[in-house]
């Protein structure tokens, strides 16, 4: 397992993402914290959470004590927060809960056809420009929506996470 723990992909943003990560969906409370700590002890450095999961505080407590540069943290903005200002506010909330200054990867959790992707991407770009997010991506986008996201974004879309 150590070999795969040391492998990473180079994202279009130029940053590297570990190939193996721990998803924290459905992990809550002290169970979440214990599992993330155990994963750290096993060598995991990539952790995936989301504002919708309700466990960012627990993930933040679990990663405390690990040098930030050793970690790769992914979080996701929920589909009701895709207006530019809402994207920024949601990210700042995630950062506070995770007790970190930046996210390595920030994803749009689910598409929302009520909000133009251009507006969402304006918020994402602001977060990149301010150093709060290193790479951006999407989750649960079909091919057409992925093309739209690529067209709407100033920075590269580095990931499409499909659940």
Would you name each region that the model predicts?
Residues 111-163:
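Beta/alpha (TIM)-barrel catalytic core signal, keyed to glycine-rich beta->alpha loops juxtaposed to Asp/Glu
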Residues 1-71, 101:
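N-terminal binding-site loop/beta-alpha segment at the start of enzyme catalytic domains
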Residues 25-27, 50-52, 76-80, 108-111, ...:
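Active-site beta-loop-alpha junctions enriched in small/polar residues
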Residues 27-40, 83-99, 119, 144-147:
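Short, acidic/polar
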Residues 18-30, 75-85, 114:
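Active-site mouth loops of central-metabolism enzymes
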Residues 87-108, 126-130, 152:
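CE4/NodB-like, metal-dependent polysaccharide N-deacetylase domain
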Residues 59-64, 91-95, 124-125, 146, ...:
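Short, well-ordered amphipathic alpha-helices
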Residues 22, 39, 47, 59, ...:
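Conserved, mostly hydrophobic/aromatic
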